[in-house]
Curated annotation (Swiss-Prot):
This is tRNA-specific 2-thiouridylase MnmA. The gene is mnmA. Residues 163-165 are annotated as: Interaction with tRNA. One of its GO terms (molecular function) is tRNA-uridine 2-sulfurtransferase activity. The lineage of its organism: Bacteria, Pseudomonadati, Pseudomonadota, Alphaproteobacteria, Rickettsiales. GO terms for cellular component: cytoplasm. The active site is at residues 117, 213. Its EC number is 2.8.1.13. It comes from Anaplasma phagocytophilum (strain HZ). Belongs to the MnmA/TRMU family. It is an enzyme of class 2 (transferase). The keyword Disulfide bond applies. It catalyses: S-sulfanyl-L-cysteinyl-[protein] + uridine(34) in tRNA + AH2 + ATP = 2-thiouridine(34) in tRNA + L-cysteinyl-[protein] + A + AMP + diphosphate + H(+).
Amino acid sequence: MINNLQLDSLVPGKRPEETTVVVAMSGGVDSSVVAVLLHKMGYKVIGATMQLYSSPNASSGKSCCGNADIYDAKKVAASFGFPHYVLNYEEVFRKEVIEDFVNSYKAGETPIPCIKCNQTVKFRDMLKMARTIGGDVVATGHYVRRLEVEGELQIWSGKDKNKDQSYFLFSMTLEQLKFVRFPLGNLVKGDVRKIAQYLNIEVADKPDSQDICFVPKNYKKTLASLDPSAIKKGKIHHIDGSVLGEHDGIANFTVGQRKGLGIAYPYPLYVVALDPVKNTVIVGPSSSLVKTQLFLRDLNWLSKDQIPEHGLSASVRLRSSSSAVQATISRSAKDGKGRVVLHEGCVVSPGQACVIYDNERLLGGGWILNQVRYSETA
């Protein structure tokens, strides 16, 4: 198991005892195993945990980066004798992640704050801190593979397909990738737990984090407390234009939703679109959910080979848990937005990430635009 770790020459030309590794420790089993193994192999390990959101109600036991997680990370570091620091990023997290979360829902989108956190706090601010204190590299517990192919750094899906986290890293830059290592990429979760148990790491049996750290139970209540203006009543329209009822705020709905509409109708209705300009929830039959085209903003590209003018054939994932589908990707020379033509119809949720792959290699991705809004401004 341990031989499968991506640990060969974390920094080419430097021995472990000459190499300072800042390990991003969440307090969970994955990053703890990374930190302890590197420490035992002779690397100069510095554990670092981000303090993102202080609230007695924020940590449900299934979220990350709460006070209990900080305590767990510090306890692991103390047990094995390497330094650990807590990084207070609450202010930047509030501005970059929480406010974006609220604004996305108000714009009729369904956001993914964990990717925003990776994009800003973790792989921007934390890497800057690591360089400041003399770190040679940063290591994390993500289940992805970092490969160098013909001199080009690439991200590939993790060996454990059930835990692969490449979807959440599409917004990384190549400059960041030079500085980051993913030692667990060739392992499966079960083996990582066995390593943790073998090494007597105290969090070996700790459950995986699942919830959003600042949304303990009910995101609707969280939205209302963060920004009451996000909850504004409006009309529910059928796709044929008829008014079917009222809603209590478009932020309470997401594309594809069926439950909670409060409308009696001859056939099941689903949310097919959200119009933030008109404050309207648009519903229709399940067949109206299926899309074959979508547009992307903030398209990030991780390959030296750019998207050709005639388009690129690749596979895309529209949710972290969804299977890949074939598509043709192109990029507007005018505004840089991505255009994705799906080879088969899918349910598309604005605000989610469309992540692009060449088999198991991560090529890049972008944020799915709300086509109701985009069509008005395009």
